[in-house]
Amino acid sequence: SWVGIGNAIIGSLIPFFLIGRRARLMSNHIDARTMPDFFGKRFDSSALKTASALIVFVFLIPYTASVYNGLSRLFGMVFDLGENGATIIIILMAVLSALYVTLGGYKATALNDFVQGIIMLIGIGTVVALTVQKKNGFSAAVDSLKSMTEDGKLGSLFGPDPINLLGVVILTSLGTWGLPQMVQKFYAIKDEQAIKKGAIISTLFAIVVAGGSYFMGGFVRLYCTLDPADTSDKAFIETGANGKPVFDTMVPALLHQALPNLLIGLVVVLVLSASLSTLSSLVLTSSSTLTNDLIRPRVKNFDDKKQMLVMRIFIAVFLLISVIIACNKNASISTLMSYSWGALSGAFLGPFLYGLFLKKASPAACWVSFFTGVGITIIHMMLFSLNISAFSGVVQTVNDMGCPLNLLSPINAGAFTMILSLILVPIVSSFTKAPDDKKVEDAFSSLNVK
């Protein structure tokens, strides 16, 4: 539940009040509707705009793949599908996403956001209540968790591993600040009152949905086991081809045991609705960013027909690569999402935040953040997640260090890139040249900042 609380407070409430007004006023004043466009105009650099557009397109792909992966696990559980069946579900969802975005566009995405929000609020409360009730109530469920280990830490306030829990909170809460959707979200806000309403609604929604989801996940050990000799009614979690337990199947297994068939159907609708909203948003963000920020400035007579054609091509490419990655069952949902957010927010968080508050923020500092965010992500992925035999010695050495912070975790790597971005940008900006004074003053004039 701490992750859900962090998502609500750090990921929803604080951004609205801390950067909502500034992001809205500045992005509208300089007419920046996307994150790459913001970097290009705020820092007077077309190269930054191009680089950030490419980063957005490339690293939204694993995020999209993680959504497909989750859907395939859930549908596989509900309909008892094998590996081939799960792959078919991924492909069908990709086709559905493409049709939905192409035919419906932004209006369909917005309408679906509203409808799926209502479904999620109702559904998550029901699912959480039944998950706990199945184990004789909250107190009995917590006591059962405590009894599973000698120290009882599974039922403690901060869980068995609070240090690595902090990494999850940072990645999923602070990480949202640097995602490319942030500029679009605040650009579209009409006035100051809308900021207050948005802060309240999004925070309450995050507490219920994110808090409820993580709260439910805390009881997964009562429904699943990794021990093949366990004779209880717990679901056995098999080992994947990479030798690691397939953790992505745990929550579907929990739902299968805790819920009646009717409510499992509700969960399918719930997740499908939420996933369709997320997928359509990601596809639109990626394809429109690359089209408007990379292609449009370089092509003459780029009319609406050409723009739509190019966007559809990018949508097809984006979804195709996402499906290929999602079909690789060795890539877990958390790993895909961690590397995506680690690269995106690790690259963009510092430049975006300081671009709103610090007049001396420099293009060079942005480049440093881009290179470190993307570079650390790629290096960590190659060393610890791709199972490259040449790096097995490095993995063993890190394992033998006995560090309480899991250095092999892509979640912690992503959290590290975000914190590093916040540290590096002001340091590098202190000894590198800021953009032209007139352009900086013009950008900040909308904020009445002297």
Where are the regions a protein language model picked out?
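Membrane-embedded helix-loop-helix hairpins and adjacent transmembrane boundary segments
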Residues: 1-450
